[in-house]
Amino acid sequence: MRDLILFLSLLHTIFASLFSLKPPSQDDFYKAPAGFKAAKPGDILKTRKSPNKPSSLYAPVDVQNSWQLLVRSEDSFGNPNAFVTTIIQPKNADPSKVVSYQNWEDASNINCSPSYGSQLGAPLSTILTQLDMTFIVPPLKSGYYVVLPDYEGPKSTFGVGRQSGKATLDSIKAVLKTKDFSGINDDAKVVLWGYSGGSFASGWAAVLQPEYAPELKDNLIGAALGGFAANLTGIAESVDGEVFSGFIPLALNGIANEYPDFKKRLYEEVKPGAKADLQKGAENCLAASLISYPMYQYFTGPRRVFEKGWSLLEDKTIGKTLEDNLLIALSKEHMPQIPIFVYHGTIDKIIPIKDSIKIYKNWCDWGIGSFEFSEDKSNGHTTETVVGAPAALTWIDARFAGKPAVEGCSFTTRASNFLYPNISESAASYFKGIYQTILRSKLGSGVTSDDVSVNGLRSLYHT
C-alpha cells in the first residue's frame, strides 16, 4: 500500500507541475453571465474544452475529447443558478448512450467540485474524486459518453436533495443539446449511476424527474444506486463518534449553504470551543475531513460538539430542514418512474442498509414499475464501492442493450455482488485489480472493514 501511495504522490507531483488548473473559486467560467436568469433550466450558458484531460488516480484517461458546460439551473427554492457539468467522449463513442455519473463529492466547498478534481493537475485535496474516476473507465471503454455534473451547484450544497436532483437533470437536458460538437444524439438514452453521495444525487434526480423534467421521460432508462444514501440522519447516527465521523461537518455545512435559517440555528447551538472545527467543514474536501475528524463526537458523548445532542434534531428549523432532504421521508407522489437498481453491503457501517431496504419496501408497496435490490452479505461501505461496481455495470449494459428490467420488485441476497449474473470477464478483472491494489487484499480474505480507506488516506497525507 505504501508503494502505491508513494507512486500516486509522485504522479500527482509530476502532472501538477505540467498541467496547471485554476480552482473554481478563481475561474471565471464558473460565474453566471449577465442576464442568465432569462434562460431556462437546462440551457447552456457557456461552453469550453476541458482545460486538461480527465484523469484517474492522477494518470490521464485515454479519451477522444472532453468539454465543460455552464448550465442554467435552480436551487431548492426555484431561484436561478448555474453550475458546471463535464462531458467525456470515449474513443469509440456511441452517440446514443450516455452515463450520467454522479461523483461522491461529499463536500461544501466549490474547490472540491468534480469538474475540477477529475482533471490532470487536480490537487491532492481532491484525491477521492481521482479514486472515483476509476469507475468511469469501463463505461468509456464500452463506448458510452460519461457526464459528470457538479450537482451541488455554485453554493456547494452537500446533503441538499432538490439542488442535487435538479442539477443532475438539468445537466442531462444540456448535454442532449450538444450534438453539434459532442456528437451526442438529442434522443440518446441516459442511465444515472452513483455510489454513496453520488447515489444521493442520483436518487433525487430519479424522484424529481417526472415533475421537474418530464421531457426526459423517453431519455432516462434507469438508475443504479450503490450504498444508497436515503436517510442523512441515519448516516449521522451511524458515523457519529466513529471512524467516518468526518462526514458530519461536511453535510451540516453543505445544508447550511442552502438554508440560512438552518445555518444560524446550527451555529447558535455549537459549543464555543468547537465552532472552529465545525467551520472547517466548509473548507475541507472529503479526504481532509475524514482524516482530520475520525472518532469525533458531534451528538454523543461528554465532548460532543452540540450540547443538546440528538435532541437538537427536535428544533423546528433544524428538524424540518433535515427532513426535507430525506429521500426516505418522501411520499408516494415522488416515486421514480424509471427502473431502479440498488446494490448495498449488509455490514455497511456508514450508510446502514436498513434504510435502503425501507425505501425498497415503500416503493414496492406503492407499485413501482421496476426495482431490483442486490444485497451483498460480505462487504461494508468502502469495499462494496468496488465489489458492487461490476454488478452495476452489468445492469447498465442490459438497459442500453434494450433488455427488459425486472417487472415489479426483486430482492436478492448474495455472498458477494461479484457473483451477480452475467458480469463480463473484463469488468470482473478490472475491479478485482482495483480491489487488490487499493484495498491491499485479495477477495475473500476478510477485508470488509469500513476503516481501510481512512488509514490509506492518512498515510498519503503524511507521506
Swiss-Prot record:
Glycosylation sites: 231, 422
EC number of the protein: 3.1.1.3
Cysteines joined through disulfide linkages: 112-285, 364-409
Catalysis performed (reactions): a triacylglycerol + H2O = a diacylglycerol + a fatty acid + H(+)
Induction context: Expression is induced in medium containing Tween 40 as the sole source of carbon. Expression is up-regulated during the yeast-to-hyphal transition. Induced during adherence to polystyrene. Expressed during experimental infection of mice. Expressed in host cecum and infected mucosal tissues (stomach, hard palate, esophagus and tongue).
Residues of the signal peptide: 1-16
Main localization of the protein described in the UniProt heading: secreted
Top-level taxon of origin: Eukaryota
Any one GO biological process: lipid catabolic process
GO terms under cellular component: extracellular region
Enzyme class: hydrolase
Residues annotated as catalytic: 196, 348, 381
Compartments, record wording: Secreted
Its biological purpose: Secreted lipase that is able to hydrolyze both the neutral triacylglycerols and the monopalmitate ester Tween 40, allowing the use of hydrolyzed products as carbon sources. Has broad lipolytic activity, which may be important for colonization and subsequent infection, therefore contributing to the persistence and virulence in human tissue.
Protein name: Lipase 6
Organism the protein comes from: Candida albicans (strain SC5314 / ATCC MYA-2876)
